[in-house]
């Protein structure tokens, strides 16, 4: 029989079968079903396939034994059906290239294929509906091939619908009606299948194959989720709901076979996508929310979806935590990404009402998630990893995460507290992590970023800065810190104080001061002694020494009187070796009966040190001890000046006058030690200005004029300003007035026009103090020689901002600066400090070259000539011939460089 004859014969048979009654189908089932299945396997026609499938499902399936459906029907029909459906998809993709409104033949072909696909899906829907109707509790073994084959067809249909714009290009409108039907039928089939699978019960003692089938179903639905995520929100959510429900329902049986990492990753991706959509909608809501506002209703719908996903993640994490070790990094990143879009400099601009709604509906669920993960060592490892290179926008979220975790630790068992509070080669402790990441939030600290404060009894919630937020929570944590972990607390605080990041160091100092107040007096005294020894042993001048000295100064104010006496005895002011320490101590910290004797003793020892230097060879190397003595005297004057009698004040003033005679202008510019001595002398002279000899004042002003012209370092200029502002208290006699006043005007003018904004600010402050106090009003207008200077002074006095910058522009600038300065400052090692530039340059033997002195002499002369030219350019217009001459000089320098290189 030919193929055509066979098709005709089968058509006759199918036509005959379609007219059978229900009773006849039941009776003839054993003989007819094998024949139908044979026809189904042999047929090459889609139409015939669909007719046979429809007859089997509608007429014979109701009479089959539900316990043998797998063997008698599904295992024989489904593989061929899948092949048929995949073939239809391939042909659709191929034919779609030729689709056009003019090509009616292709239109008909494509529409017929789509209708055939819908009919295939309808046939499988009938299978699922029948199983659901006949079995209250489904045994998975009796339908084991049905779920996987159906899910394959559903996914293929959804993928085709999702890619339809690409497949059909600009001709989608010709088939869009059938694509909608295809999507709805696949949607309906999946709902029917999920209803069927919901009745499945897995017994741990049954065949392991059943568990694998359920695992395969969950993973297939996971793939479908990724396809439909942007197509239908409700359907997407329902699919996820089923995945989570079945995963937890059969958890005891399938927990070890599930791809937990993939489930968590997909769920986190959907959370982020929904949250991003929610924020975009929130940005569009400019008017107060109203029930009739379509944008607001869509925002609420998306926010509920975010909450649903977060709840799903919360439930899944709770049950499957032991299997989530390789998902902890994903969960960590989820928390950071969400908060980066809500709180950081990169956050979306939404109204306060929307922010509160998002926080109360969605963000609130992240807190119990962290509670669940708190005991997980892999999560701790992920959060506190030493090599965690986070981008700028995730630094603030990292700080907030660590603060949330820290707040929860006091209620946790000691082993959990220890887990978070210890560190090793691969991870930091939580305290170290907070301090480090806090230091990276320069942009948020400078704006500053505000966070929601905690509510007190009867008090409204007040926004607080990031600094306040972290500091308060750190102090609360310290108050509840387990005693066995105190050594780690001390180490973390000290490490942070020694940080080169100013914000980190100040935060650690504030926490340490809280500890000094909260802890025992004995603990406070121990810490003061510890820091004092560190200050004494710290070499050279470095930021770490500055930080330690500030901490020491603050801690002393919390020291009990008996311990203050012990401190004075341990670090006696009578010993010159202790002067290095006392220069950093404010005597205001001591009780009044201790302050005066300490002040007098320090001044006596310092005067002796100054006399010793005056009677020595006065080398640069010996300036170290002199500077220390001067620094101590300045500290005493500023913190306990009233404790000194007139005799001591006079003696100090005399020493200052003698020391001033050794000031050398050239060394001020080139030698750091001389710069420090010069600055200290100026500040001390400013303190004693009422008793300083007028001739000495004239000499000082004359030196200052020369120094300012050479553009000294900023710290020297600041000392100059201290001295200048003090002159406002002084009446300058006629004998030196003509020398002093014009010089003062020149100095102030030079510093006001300085391009350094900090120096300019201090100059304006010094000028204001001088102008308000001086009896020589005629000098004030002389200092305001140009319109630019007048405007700066007026703006300063009126407290007006020099630049009116929009909030958005300010945030953008801060983000840009944060990106530029994101790399943390390099740590200063002890060796670097020992050989720091603050020390005078060490002399060493050198090889004498022929004509070397001549080379040096000529080069110094050339350098001085260039400095003079630079000075002239800053105070006058350049002549026309200067630029060509400089270019010619540049050419000669290049020629000389080539001569040096070639020898």
UniProtKB/Swiss-Prot annotation:
Q: Does the keyword NAD apply?
A: no
Q: How is it modified after translation?
A: Phosphorylation at Ser-101 by PLK1 strengthens FIRRM-PLK1 interaction. Phosphorylation at Ser-795 by PLK1 negatively regulates its interaction with PPP1CC.
Any idea where this protein resides?
Chromosome, Centromere, Kinetochore; Nucleus; Chromosome, Centromere; Midbody
One Pfam match, by short name?
DUF4487
| Record PTM N6-acetyllysine, positions in chain | 843
* Any one of the GO CC terms: cytoplasm
GO annotation terms (biological process) = chromosome segregation; interstrand cross-link repair; mitotic cell cycle
Q: How does it assemble?
A: Interacts (via its N-terminal region) with PLK1; controls PLK1 kinase activity. Interacts (via the KVVXF motif) with PPP1CC; controls PLK1 kinase activity. Interacts with FIGNL1; may regulate homologous recombination.
In UniProt terms, what function does this protein have? Regulates PLK1 kinase activity at kinetochores and promotes faithful chromosome segregation in prometaphase by bridging kinase and phosphatase activities. Phosphorylation of FIRRM by PLK1 negatively regulates its interaction with the phosphatase, PPP1CC, thus creating a negative feedback loop for maintaining proper PLK1 kinase activity during mitosis. In complex with FIGL1 may regulate homologous recombination.
**Protein name stated in the entry:** FIGNL1-interacting regulator of recombination and mitosis
Q: What organism is the protein native to?
A: Mus musculus (Mouse)
Protein encoded by which gene: Firrm
């Amino acid at each position: 029989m030919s193929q055509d004859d066979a098709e005709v014969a089968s058509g006759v048979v199918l036509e005959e079968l379609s007219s059978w009654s229900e009773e006849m189908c039941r009776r003839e089932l054993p003989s007819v079903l094998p024949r139908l299945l044979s026809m189904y396997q042999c047929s090459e026609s889609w139409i015939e396939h669909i007719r046979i499938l429809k007859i089997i499902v509608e007429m014979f399936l109701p009479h089959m034994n539900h316990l043998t459906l797998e063997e008698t029907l599904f295992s024989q029909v489904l593989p061929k059906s899948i092949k048929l459906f995949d073939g239809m998809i391939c042909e659709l993709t191929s034919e779609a290239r030729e689709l056009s409104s003019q090509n009616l033949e292709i239109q008909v072909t494509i529409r017929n294929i789509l209708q055939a696909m819908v009919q295939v899906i309808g046939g499988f829907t009938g299978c699922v509906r029948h199983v659901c109707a006949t079995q209250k509790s489904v045994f998975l073994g009796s339908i084991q091939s049905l779920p996987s084959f159906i899910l394959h067809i559903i996914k293929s249909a959804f993928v085709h619908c999702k890619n339809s714009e690409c497949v059909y290009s600009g001709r989608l409108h010709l088939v869009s009606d059938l694509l909608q039907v295809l999507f709805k039928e696949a949607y309906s089939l999946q709902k029917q299948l999920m209803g069927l699978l919901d009745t499945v019960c897995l017994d741990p003692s049954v065949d392991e194959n059943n568990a694998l089938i359920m695992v395969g179903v969950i993973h297939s639905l996971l793939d479908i989720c990724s396809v439909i995520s942007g197509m239908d929100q409700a359907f997407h959510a329902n699919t996820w709901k089923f995945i989570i429900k079945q995963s937890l329902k059969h958890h005891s049986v399938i927990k070890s076979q599930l791809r937990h990492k993939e489930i968590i990753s997909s769920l986190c991706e959907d959370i982020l996508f929904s949250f991003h959509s929610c924020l975009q909608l929130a940005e569009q809501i400019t008017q107060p929310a109203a029930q009739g506002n379509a944008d607001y209703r869509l925002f609420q719908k998306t926010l509920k979806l975010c909450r649903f996903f977060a709840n799903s993640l919360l439930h899944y994490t709770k049950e499957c935590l032991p299997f989530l070790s390789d998902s902890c990094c994903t969960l960590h990143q989820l928390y950071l990404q969400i908060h980066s879009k809500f709180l950081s400099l990169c956050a979306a601009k939404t109204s306060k009402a929307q922010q509160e709604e998002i926080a109360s509906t969605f963000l609130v669920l992240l807190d119990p998630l962290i509670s669940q993960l708190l005991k997980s060592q892999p999560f701790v490892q992920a959060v506190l990893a030493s090599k965690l290179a986070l981008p700028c926008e995730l630094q603030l979220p990292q700080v907030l995460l660590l603060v949330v975790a820290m707040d929860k630790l006091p209620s946790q068992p000691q082993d959990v507290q220890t887990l978070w509070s210890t560190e090793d080669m691969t991870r930091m402790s939580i305290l170290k992590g907070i301090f480090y990441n806090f230091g990276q939030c320069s942009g948020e600290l400078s704006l500053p970023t505000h966070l929601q404060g905690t509510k007190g009894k009867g008090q409204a919630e007040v926004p607080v800065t990031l600094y306040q937020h972290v500091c308060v929570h750190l102090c609360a944590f310290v108050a509840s810190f387990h005693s066995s972990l105190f050594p780690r607390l001390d180490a973390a605080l000290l490490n942070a104080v020694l940080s080169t990041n100013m914000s980190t160091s100040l935060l650690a100092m504030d926490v340490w001061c809280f500890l000094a107040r909260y802890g025992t007096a004995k603990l406070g005294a121990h810490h003061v002694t510890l820091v004092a020894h560190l200050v004494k042993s710290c070499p050279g001048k470095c930021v770490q020494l500055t930080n330690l000295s500030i901490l020491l100064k603050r801690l002393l104010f919390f020291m009990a009187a008996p311990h203050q006496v012990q401190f004075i005895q341990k670090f006696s002011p009578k010993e010159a070796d202790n002067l290095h320490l006392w220069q950093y101590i404010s005597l205001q910290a001591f009780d009044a009966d201790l302050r005066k004797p300490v002040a007098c003793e320090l001044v006596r020892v310092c005067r002796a040190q100054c006399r010793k230097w005056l009677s020595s060879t006065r080398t640069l190397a010996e300036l170290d001890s002199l500077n220390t003595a001067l620094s101590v005297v300045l500290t005493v004057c500023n913190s306990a000046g009233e404790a000194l009698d007139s005799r001591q004040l006079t003696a100090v003033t005399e020493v200052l006058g003698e020391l001033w005679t050794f000031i050398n202008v050239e060394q001020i510019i080139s030698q750091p030690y001389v710069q420090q001595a010069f600055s200290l002398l100026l500040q001390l002279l400013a303190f004693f200005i009422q008793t300083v000899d007028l001739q000495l004042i004239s000499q000082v002003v004359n030196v200052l004029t020369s120094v300012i012209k050479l553009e000294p370092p900023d710290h020297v200029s600041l000392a100059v300003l201290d001295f200048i502002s003090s002159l406002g208290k002084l009446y300058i006699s006629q004998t030196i007035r003509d020398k002093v006043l014009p010089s003062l005007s020149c100095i102030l003018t030079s510093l006001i026009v300085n391009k350094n904004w900090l120096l300019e600010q201090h100059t304006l402050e010094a000028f204001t103090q001088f102008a308000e106090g001086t009896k020589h009003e005629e000098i004030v207008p002389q200092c305001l020689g140009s319109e630019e200077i007048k405007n700066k002074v007026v703006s300063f006095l009126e407290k007006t901002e020099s630049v009116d910058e929009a909030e958005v522009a300010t945030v953008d600038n801060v983000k840009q600066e944060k990106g530029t300065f994101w790399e943390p400052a390099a740590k200063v090692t002890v060796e670097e400090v020992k050989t720091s530039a603050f020390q005078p340059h060490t002399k060493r033997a050198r090889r004498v070259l022929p004509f070397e002195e001549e080379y040096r002499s000529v080069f110094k002369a050339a350098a001085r000539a260039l400095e003079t030219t630079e000075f002239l350019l800053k105070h006058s217009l350049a002549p026309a011939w200067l630029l060509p001459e400089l270019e010619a000089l540049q050419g000669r320098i290049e020629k000389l460089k080539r001569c040096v290189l070639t020898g």
